Amino acid sequence: MTKQMLLENVSFRYGKTGPLIVDHVSCEVYSGDFIGIIGPNGGGKTTLTQLMLGLLQPVCGSISTYSVQDHRPLSIGWVPQHFSYDAAFPITVKETVLSGRLATLPWYGRYTQEDHEAAEEALLTVDLIDYKDSCFSHLSGGQIQRVLLARALAARPEFLLLDEPTANIDPVNQQKILQILSALNKHCTILMITHDLHHTAGCFNRVFFMNKTLTTLADTTTISERFCCNTFGRCP
């Protein structure tokens, strides 16, 4: 297995004197992992992923990333929990997915043929290619979540971070997203925050329980809400 991310004694707080939100967390993530991140609200799960993305900087400790592609930085895709948009803005599904390619635009700022091909490939992956010309705001909540996943996939990442991608959507789209992620895991490392242990625990090869500190649970077959409450005193 190839190491893709290493966290060593990472801590984070907001402000100079605030309490630690992430408290001396250490872990390793390997190529091909499908890791669930569980824990109570306020336990630091989202903050941990923002540190992994480089959106926040730790007050101590270090985060190292390693690409399986020589001489390139690790490419990370990100699917946030909350996504705000103006429902009156007439953007199509494909245009939304294309925005995931903004970081790769050439100096003249126009999407290339490769960008369009990557966007359509991502829409095929999430089974929404027939909606590419539809207005984004006309989609259901579950379809929107799949479009956001496609937007992350458009950049063809090696490593995918998701913050509760199956929360507050219908069961059909929940199952669809989990099937898509399981297929993607054949060539993409995945870390996913979730509260839905009943449907998701079987997807993971490891689980991180995050409540300011981090505990790694290797046997995912025994993980349940009751297990977490009994073991850690807090429920996810």
From Swiss-Prot:
Membrane topology reported for the UniProt record: Peripheral membrane protein
Predominant location category: membrane
Annotated ranges, domain ABC transporter: 5-236
SUPFAM superfamilies on file: P-loop containing nucleoside triphosphate hydrolases
Protein name: Probable metal transport system ATP-binding protein CT_416
Residues reported to bind ATP: 39-46
PROSITE patterns: ABC_TRANSPORTER_1, ABC_TRANSPORTER_2
Gene3D superfamilies to which the protein is assigned, alphabetical: P-loop containing nucleotide triphosphate hydrolases
Keywords: ATP-binding, Cell inner membrane, Cell membrane, Membrane, Nucleotide-binding, Transport
